[in-house]
């Protein structure tokens, strides 16, 4: 096999990064079995250095058990590892531990995974896989006897949402709302919880737009309020048009089912993290061969 083919096979078998596979093969005279041993022996030493890297890929997962719904994000560096069974097992382990032990948002940082604090629990997997593996964040919603929880995780594990409503409703109803939330990604549940700093910035943008458009000052205030209301409706879950029945808002859809939304969170993998430019497999091999 060519060096590139050896690298690809070693990466497939070990889930190690491209650069680590090349180093392992170089140190093992291109013997794959010896390279696997080299990776295992050297992984732990290099894991700490991997933690300095940016982990912008990964998964978001949501699940409910009893009166509790949990939403988490666990990160790695590439979509290749995000699909790895060991990585997915680790992420699901965190999810199950959170469902069993988390009672408030602060409890996520107190979780113990495989005998280690959650902040350190990804180190062994980082050593084995060769990419930074880290728990990034989590949210919890809890229901009382007169409330219902809804959860949704998209089938690619890249977006997920949890929702809490007042009222006892069918699971399908709250799952539909959670699915809508995961797809549309509204910033807020309703206008009452809108970040006023964000709202002020949106207003400032509109004012600057009107200046460039040369709109008459007499109409400026009305135009500003109109555009701001439109932005609020687009960014508040309860005011959005329900994607399965666009003639209804989410608020109206829930009202028709005797429910009111009172809690909501959604995650998208890597949101807010600066991402490095992506390379193809061939380009990545070529770049590593030049080192």
UniProtKB/Swiss-Prot annotation:
Superkingdom of the source species: Bacteria
Bridged cysteine pairs (disulfide): none
Cell compartment(s), UniProt: Cytoplasm
InterPro entries associated with the record: EF-Ts_dimer_sf (IPR036402), Transl_elong_EFTs/EF1B (IPR001816), Transl_elong_EFTs/EF1B_dimer (IPR014039), Transl_elong_Ts_CS (IPR018101), UBA-like_sf (IPR009060)
Family: Belongs to the EF-Ts family.
Job of this protein: Associates with the EF-Tu.GDP complex and induces the exchange of GDP to GTP. It remains bound to the aminoacyl-tRNA.EF-Tu.GTP complex up to the GTP hydrolysis stage on the ribosome.
NCBIfam families reported for this sequence: tsf
PANTHER family for the chain: ELONGATION FACTOR TS (PTHR11741), ELONGATION FACTOR TS, MITOCHONDRIAL (PTHR11741:SF0)
Protein name: Elongation factor Ts
Organism: Ureaplasma urealyticum serovar 10 (strain ATCC 33699 / Western)
Origin organism lineage: Bacteria, Bacillati, Mycoplasmatota, Mycoplasmoidales, Mycoplasmoidaceae
């Amino acid at each position: 096999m060519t060096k590139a083919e050896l690298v690809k096979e070693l990466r497939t078998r070990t889930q190690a990064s491209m650069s680590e596979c090349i180093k392992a093969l170089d140190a093992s005279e291109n013997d794959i079995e010896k390279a696997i041993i080299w990776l295992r022996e050297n992984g732990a030493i290099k894991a700490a250095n991997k933690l300095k890297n940016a982990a912008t890929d990964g998964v978001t997962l949501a699940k409910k058990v009893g009166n509790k719904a949990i939403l988490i994000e666990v990160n790695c560096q590439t979509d290749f590892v995000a699909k790895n069974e060991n990585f997915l097992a680790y992420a699901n382990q965190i999810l199950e531990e959170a469902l069993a032990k988390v009672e408030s948002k602060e409890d996520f940082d107190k979780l113990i995974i495989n005998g280690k604090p959650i902040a350190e629990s990804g180190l062994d997997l980082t050593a084995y896989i060769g990419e930074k593996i880290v728990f990034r964040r989590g949210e919890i919603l809890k229901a009382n006897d007169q409330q219902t929880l809804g959860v949704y995780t998209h089938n690619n594990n890249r977006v997920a949402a949890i929702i809490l409503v007042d009222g006892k409703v069918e699971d399908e109803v709250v799952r539909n709302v959670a699915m809508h939330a995961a797809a549309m990604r509204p910033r807020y549940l309703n206008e009452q919880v809108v970040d006023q700093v964000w709202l002020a910035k949106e207003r400032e943008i509109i004012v600057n737009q009107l200046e460039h458009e040369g709109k008459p000052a007499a109409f400026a205030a009305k135009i500003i309020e109109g555009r701001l209301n439109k932005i609020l409706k687009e960014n508040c879950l309860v005011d959005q048009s329900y994607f399965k029945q666009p003639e209804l808002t989410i608020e109206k859809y829930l009202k028709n089912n005797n429910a009111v939304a009172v809690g909501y969170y959604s995650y998208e993998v890597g949101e807010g993290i600066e991402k490095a430019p992506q390379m193809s497999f061939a380009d990545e091999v070529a770049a590593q061969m030049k080192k």
